Structures are given as C-alpha cells and as structure tokens.
Amino acid sequence: MNKAYYIAAGLAAIYAAFYLRKAKAGKKRVAVVGDSLSLSSAGWQNILAGRYGWDIDNFSKIGQTSGQALARFMASSNTYDTVFIFLGANDTYGGINPAFTIDNLKKIIELAKDKGAKTIVIPGILSSKVSSSPEALKYDDLKSKMIYLPGMVVPILRTVDRKDVPDGLHFGAATHKQLADLIDSWSLR
C-alpha cells in the first residue's frame, strides 16, 4: 500500500468520526430551560424530541427571566443527558443588565454540567431581521455575547421570514422548524 492510500483512509476515518456521527435515538433525558420561545406545541423542542425519541422536562415559562429559570432549574434534582438553554428575551425586554443575563446563563451551564449533562445554548433568531425596536437590537447584542459561553452555542438563525414572527419576537411553525433544523445540524450531528 502506498502513502496516499493511508492518508486517504485516515482522512475518511476522521470525517466519519466527526461528521457522520448523530445523536442516537432513544430515551435520552433532555431538559429545556427557556421562556415562551420554548413552549409552543409545534416548537423546536418538540420537533427534535419527535425526531430523536427524547423524554423532555421543559423548565420554560412565559415571561421567565434567566434568573427565574436558574432558580427553577436549580430546584430540580433530576439529571439529564442534554440541557438546551434558550433565554434572554425577557431579560432584554425587561431592561435587565446583559452582564447579569450572561452570568445566569453561565450558572445554568455549570449546574447542568455538574449533573453530567451536555449543554447547548440557543441564541435564537436575528431579531433585527423582524423588528427595528431598540429592544430587538439589544437582544441581538446579548446574543452576540453568548458565543463566548462555555459549551456548545448554536449560531443565530439569520434566514427568518418576518411574516412568521408577527410580533417581532414569537415565531410560528416555519421558523420553529428552521430553528430545529439548525440546532440538529449544528449540535446533534
């Protein structure tokens, strides 16, 4: 065998190991720590649970801030394989200092990892594509800071149809599917 063969075989093995792996279907225990953006019955979390057969504990609540989410998640004694964290909208729209939000997200990540979970932070959509409000711009600024959080951070979904986000914040089924596909391709494959 020649050297080129071994190089090609090695590259193929590396490709297979890192790019063809997929989260195994089955009864993985998954937690979602979020707000109203993670509560839709046709939401990204249920789309992914359907694809992978997960059992989900959803700690999301309408109007929930990162501080409230941290307290709710901290009160749980359950352990999870994966914890999805999708927070920040209510902090931003409520005028909470972004440094506090980032600190709360770090605490949620640390708590999840202490319980043995993989963490996946979801910044969500590019809000300035669907709203020109000052809060939308501040929310995008917060999302840009999330990339420095420990663990996996999904990229911001930038291809959003304004018609599917009528209030500039909450999105419909098409955007939930886009977000589920982005999360799937970025963090689960």
Q: Which stretches of residues belong to each language-model region?
A:
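Catalytic His-Asp segment of secreted/periplasmic serine-dependent ester chemistry enzymes
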Residues: 37, 75, 127-189
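A short helix->loop->beta-strand "cap" motif at the edges of active sites that frequently abuts
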Residues: 114-119
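Anion (oxyanion) recognition and catalysis
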Residues: 50, 113, 147
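Hydrophobic positions in alpha-helices of CheY-like receiver
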Residues: 108-112
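Conserved SGNH/GDSL esterase-like catalytic core that processes O-acyl groups on lipids
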Residues: 26-33, 37-107, 127-137, 170
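Single-pass alpha-helical membrane anchors
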Residues: 1-21
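Short strand-turn motif at the edge of the Rossmann-like AdoMet-binding core
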Residues: 123-125
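Acidic, glycine/proline-rich intrinsically disordered low-complexity segments
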Residues: 1, 22-29, 78-79, 177-181, ...
